[in-house]
Amino acid sequence: DYGIKQLESLIDSGYKIDLNQGMDARLVTDEIAQILSKLKWIRYLRFSCDSTPQIAAIHKTAELLGKYGIKPSKMLIYLLVTSDLANAEYRVEQLKTIRGISIYAQAERNESMGITPNKLQREFAQRYVYSGKFRTLSWTEYARGKGLID
């Protein structure tokens, strides 16, 4: 409730805002979508998609925001790329059905827990998604074309 009140207080402030951490789309209700639509954004409304259950919520959020005039092209989705590349590919394929949405992939890294991205995770995030190849090719098609997988 506190965060929502803070956002509401910014509506007529004249400030352009940027919530640079990915918001949780599962928390976006009709009321929150309406509040988000009234704010002035620097560029994107940023959401995260770290796991498969978040996909449906992102689709619903895009629909709710659309109801209040916010196009999917104003949405950026942070996509966590774990060692399960099939799951990352699935999430990308599901998200790209929201026409106009932007995706920023980040390979999982947590050195204190011994997690560092492997070569394929880095390729997925830095070359496949960042270059926009995901819009026309599946990860499997891209990786086979590059000789990364059989």
Segments (PLM) and residue ranges:
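Auxiliary Fe-S-binding modules of radical SAM enzymes
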Residues: 67-70, 78-150
